């Protein structure tokens, strides 16, 4: 088996990261959000909705991943100590500030896609009250350890790539939680046009 092709792919990816870091990471995120939402819909077994996958990919590509890129750069500039002395503060600050913010950002973006100018603020508040802390607890079971490894051992250029691999499963969870209330609404209206996920907590 010729492994040179993998070397070429790796070198091309590295060069792309150096020349177009945000675009490269965002496109990688597109693949991750595609896999996460497709897996979520497969598990739900309600039929595949490509519009929802497109929506989640759009949120990931243009909203989530670019913010993570600049957030990681901010952490690297703010906490400059080597080893664990720099990694631990990054993880703590990330999990207490940016992690919760990013979840709210994701949920809000999905609701905007579903409702547009008819955005229901009461539904948004109810959703935050119901889902915010349960999802945050799930996040804290995954991301503190993951980010400890990222900030301690992984080169900054490749952190989002490694994070994206973990995110396939995590985005499956996010896709489920972000879309679940719209599934209930569509079921009540007997509208099969939007296939969404049932609650993880039910």
Swiss-Prot record:
The chain crosses the membrane at residues 21-41, 54-72, 138-154, 161-177. InterPro entries: Mpv17_PMP22. Its main location: membrane. The keyword Glycosyltransferase does not apply. Disulfide bonds: none annotated. One of its GO terms (cellular component) is membrane. It is a multi-pass membrane protein. The keyword Transferase does not apply. PANTHER family: PEROXISOMAL MEMBRANE PROTEIN 2, PXMP2 MPV17, PROTEIN MPV17. This is PXMP2/4 family protein 1. It comes from Dictyostelium discoideum. The lineage of its organism: Eukaryota, Amoebozoa, Evosea, Eumycetozoa, Dictyostelia.
């Amino acid at each position: 088996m010729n492994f040179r092709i993998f070397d070429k792919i790796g070198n091309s990816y590295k060069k792309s990261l150096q020349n177009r870091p945000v675009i490269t990471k965002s496109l990688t995120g597109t693949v991750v959000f595609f896999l996460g939402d497709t897996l979520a819909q497969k598990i739900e077994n309600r039929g595949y909705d490509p519009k929802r996958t497109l929506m989640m990919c759009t949120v990931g590509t243009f909203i989530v991943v670019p913010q993570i890129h600049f957030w990681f750069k901010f952490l690297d500039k703010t906490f400059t100590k080597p080893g664990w002395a720099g990694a631990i503060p990054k993880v703590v600050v990330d999990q207490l500030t940016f992690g919760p913010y990013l979840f709210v950002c994701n949920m809000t973006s999905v609701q905007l896609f579903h409702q547009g100018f008819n955005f229901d603020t009461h539904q948004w508040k109810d959703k935050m009250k119901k889902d915010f802390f349960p999802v945050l607890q799930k996040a804290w079971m995954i991301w503190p350890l993951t980010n400890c490894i990222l900030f301690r051992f992984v080169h900054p250029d490749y952190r989002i790539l490694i994070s994206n691999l973990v995110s396939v499963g995590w985005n499956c969870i996010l896709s489920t939680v972000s879309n679940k209330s719209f599934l209930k609404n569509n079921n009540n209206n007997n509208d099969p046009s939007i296939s969404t996920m049932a609650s993880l907590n039910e």
